[in-house]
């Protein structure tokens, strides 16, 4: 089932590997601006790992968006405080978010699978990525208690919490 947008907050290449049999997708990664002299917030890669033009994303059937970067194909990472200070400074006006992500979200909601929101930075990114999206939003949570901040965040974004075993739910799909 091709999804138009997958937002992956892990640094690993697992989702890239899962898409490896397809050619109709592109990956967009957040990049550190430490060595950049231009106003670049992300890079676009084709399935082979080659740099692609940012406007090529509009023709892709699926966008794999990795806002924190990834180990593959180019080892882009946002990990330093200085990386996040720049992003957080600009994220309210949506500068670090690719145009194709903004366009896709206008008519859709989000389903969050496999990530917890007990970290302020993850909540900040999620809040800004889903900004101006249509909704509804769902959060798949295994049978673990939510933190107070997670409960508050889910209420704030209007997300319905689905408590289920991820593997059992995937088997039903």
Indicate residue ranges for each PLM-predicted region.
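SIR2/sirtuin NAD+-dependent deacylase catalytic core
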Residues: 1-173
């Amino acid at each position: 089932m091709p999804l138009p947008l997958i937002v992956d907050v892990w640094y690993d290449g697992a989702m890239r590997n899962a898409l490896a049999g397809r050619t109709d997708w592109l990956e967009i990664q957040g990049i550190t601006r430490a060595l950049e002299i231009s106003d670049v917030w992300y890079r676009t890669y084709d399935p082979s790992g080659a740099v692609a033009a940012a406007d090529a994303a509009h023709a892709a059937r699926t966008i794999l968006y990795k806002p924190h970067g990834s180990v593959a194909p180019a080892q882009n990472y946002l990990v330093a405080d200085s990386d996040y200070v720049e992003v957080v400074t600009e994220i309210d006006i949506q500068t670090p978010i690719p145009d194709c992500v903004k366009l896709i979200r206008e008519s859709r909601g989000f389903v969050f699978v496999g990530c917890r929101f007990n970290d302020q930075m993850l909540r900040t990114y999620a809040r800004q990525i889903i900004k101006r999206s249509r909704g509804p939003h769902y959060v798949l949570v295994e049978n673990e208690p939510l933190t107070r901040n997670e409960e508050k965040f889910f209420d704030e974004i209007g997300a319905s919490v689905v408590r289920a075993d991820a593997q059992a739910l995937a088997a039903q799909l």
